[in-house]
Amino acid sequence: MMQLVHGGDWAGYRAQYGQDALDFSANVSPLGLPEGVAKAITAALATADRYPDPLCRALRAKLAVHETVPAEHILCGNGAADLIFRLVWAAKPRTALLPAPTFAEYAAALETAGCTVRGQFLREIEDFAVTEAFISAVDEDTDMVFLCQPNNPTGQLTPLALVEALLHRCEACGALLVVDECFLDFLPQSEVLSAKKLLASPNLIILKAFTKLYGMAGVRLGYCLCSNIALLDKMQAAGQPWAVSCLLYTSPSPRD
């Protein structure tokens, strides 16, 4: 039987124990699906007889306004996990560096591509914070680095100055830096904390998702920000053409 490493497997729990669980593993907003999104999905049912836009043009246009980045720097996917796998398959890293502990999906994706995964263990004496030691662990053999902001499961936020220093180290070593900001919007002043101001670097990829903050894990919608158009093109080609349902690509922007 296939074993899942990600949380939120309520169906598996129900099948095994005959009841629902109080699930603290998925960290999804308890407030439910926003009313505007529910209405947009209902309205979009009228288009269900047509294939969705494979480039998510309408959704990317709204996200571009929300994120204040060019639409061509945005790629939408079937949740952030879809984009993690697409990135790994597109970039084909040989060696990757992760903080430990961190979100298990990074290593799961990397291993499907035959990538060697190195973990830099975070220290309890430092409150499991990412420090300069993690930056120093990036070397010439490192092709990809993942950083979860804030980290899952420790909850620690890496200061933006340290993220910038990590990016510079990755640039010097020829590595891609993947900053996962799927939880960042739960924090006050998330816009100030975001690595978006560093997006001029072609080595930076930022992951975002509607899953957590907007209580729509079952809907599956994520996106990434990156100024490296060639890399985004490879990621687009690394997955199926219609990753985002027609029920979603015209949904309201996060501001709605």
Can you name each region flagged by the protein language model?
Residues M235-A237:
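Anionic-ligand binding region
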Residues A200-D233, C246-L247:
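Active-site PLP attachment segment
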Residues Y249-D256:
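Conserved small/polar residues in nucleotide/adenosyl-binding loops
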Residues F128-D141, P153-L177, E181-L213:
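Active-site pre-lysine segment of PLP-dependent enzymes
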Residues M1-R50:
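N-terminal "arm"/small-domain region of PLP-dependent enzymes with the aminotransferase-like
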Residues F24, V145, D180-C182, L207, ...:
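Structural scaffold positions in well-ordered secondary structure
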Residues W89-L147:
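PLP-dependent aminotransferase-like
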Residues P52, A64-R86:
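Short loop-beta-helix segment that forms the pyridoxal 5′-phosphate
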